[in-house]
Amino acid sequence: MGLLVFVRNLLLALCLFLVLGFLYYSAWKLHLLQWEEDSNSVVLSFDSAGQTLGSEYDRLGFLLNLDSKLPAELATKYANFSEGACKPGYASALMTAIFPRFSKPAPMFLDDSFRKWARIREFVPPFGIKGQDNLIKAILSVTKEYRLTPALDSLRCRRCIIVGNGGVLANKSLGSRIDDYDIVVRLNSAPVKGFEKDVGSKTTLRITYPEGAMQRPEQYERDSLFVLAGFKWQDFKWLKYIVYKERVSASDGFWKSVATRVPKEPPEIRILNPYFIQEAAFTLIGLPFNNGLMGRGNIPTLGSVAVTMALHGCDEVAVAGFGYDMSTPNAPLHYYETVRMAAIKESWTHNIQREKEFLRKLVKARVITDLSSGI
């Protein structure tokens, strides 16, 4: 009798397991289906609560008729804030108003619970962490810091600016305005020294990947956090070398020479949550899904990724140095070098036009502020 009860309970447990597994798999497939639609087809859009959006929204879920005026409820909410005062929740509130699918909660950096994050677990880099568990675990076991600095974490309201590398920054004298922000994010190896008048002198985060990292240790700002954006598995391997101060091999799958040393102690190093790359690419910009793999024209630029990160982690968001003007092919591409605008047309991975459309939506709806007016 006892054996029959045991077998019955075992079968019930097995059935329950199979049902739950089927439901989980079905939900996952439905979730992927929304991204796998052809980029030219109509995509059903839902808000963050799963409700279908109406015809007043575009295929991605953005409001079609964007207005620079604040929605009435937000105008009332922020009416009593003085000019220049930081407005808590401002960027995310406006983002949700024009894009109801937006859901703010998302950690800025990977922490020791990263393997529990379903949104990134099933995707390989750059859209997730699949296959990178051991490397990431080894890195985090040494860095042991997963947040902003305590001083920044304690702020009731955070004003952030993403400083792009665009030539539009030259001769704008925006340096002092940039330095007024609580968090100043810089990208790749864009220099500060010698350009302070236009780009400021403050750096809070420097987000990069191995090929984009500064190669001379003296170029790094002393008080900034070094943040890896992992676009391929070799990037995580490179960061492990850096954190453990091991020798970096130049032949480890990089498309150009990389830094062999980063003058930062492990607690000053972070790994960007790859969800922001995934969200920017497929949800906000609408790049081809390509089965969740890196492919032609489906990788967002680091600038758009940083903006996406800021929408989740900051109360107010601004940009400077953004925007490519393809009508002026001989204009400088970056503020610090002589490479011309035409070079960006040769990009295999980016879709500059789609990104421009995304950023223009944010500027028009006042979700972000464009200090250099390049977007």
UniProtKB/Swiss-Prot annotation:
Expression sites (tissue/organ): Highly expressed in adult skeletal muscle and in all fetal tissues examined and to a much lesser extent in placenta, lung and liver.
- Coiled-coil ranges per the record? none
Chief place of localization: Golgi
S-S bonds: C160-C314
Q: Note whether Iron occurs among the keywords.
A: no
UniProt GO cellular component terms = extracellular region; Golgi cisterna membrane; Golgi membrane
InterPro entries found in the cross-reference section: Glyco_trans_29, Glycosyltransferase_29, GT29-like_sf, Sialyl_trans
Q: Which residues lie on this side of the membrane: Cytoplasmic?
A: 1-8
Q: How does the record classify its membrane topology?
A: Single-pass type II membrane protein
What EC number(s) does its UniProt record assign? 2.4.3.6
Location of this chain's protein in the cell: Golgi apparatus, Golgi stack membrane; Secreted
What PTM annotation applies here? The soluble form derives from the membrane form by proteolytic processing.
Q: Does the keyword Membrane apply?
A: yes
Task: Recite the UniProt keywords alphabetically.
Answer: Disease variant, Disulfide bond, Epilepsy, Glycoprotein, Glycosyltransferase, Golgi apparatus, Intellectual disability, Membrane, Secreted, Signal-anchor, Transferase, Transmembrane, Transmembrane helix
Q: Name one GO biological process term.
A: viral protein processing
So which stretches are on the Lumenal side? Answer: 29-375
Effect listed in the UniProt record for changing D370Y? In MRT12; the mutant protein is improperly localized to the endoplasmic reticulum preventing the protein from interacting with its substrates in the Golgi and resulting in a loss-of-function; shows a complete lack of enzyme activity; secretion of the mutant protein is dramatically reduced compared to wild-type
Q: Which GO terms describe its molecular function?
A: beta-galactoside (CMP) alpha-2,3-sialyltransferase activity; N-acetyllactosaminide alpha-2,3-sialyltransferase activity; sialyltransferase activity
> What pathway does the UniProt record associate with this protein?
Protein modification; protein glycosylation
Its transmembrane ranges are 9-28
Which positions are glycosylated?
N80, N171
| Family as reported in the entry's similarity comment | Belongs to the glycosyltransferase 29 family.
Q: Report the function annotation for this chain.
A: Catalyzes the formation of the NeuAc-alpha-2,3-Gal-beta-1,4-GlcNAc-, NeuAc-alpha-2,3-Gal-beta-1,3-GlcNAc- and NeuAc-alpha-2,3-Gal-beta-1,3-GalNAc- sequences found in terminal carbohydrate groups of glycoproteins and glycolipids. The highest activity is toward Gal-beta-1,3-GlcNAc and the lowest toward Gal-beta-1,3-GalNAc.
**Protein name, UniProt field:** CMP-N-acetylneuraminate-beta-1,4-galactoside alpha-2,3-sialyltransferase
Species whose genome carries this gene: Homo sapiens
Gene it is expressed from: ST3GAL3
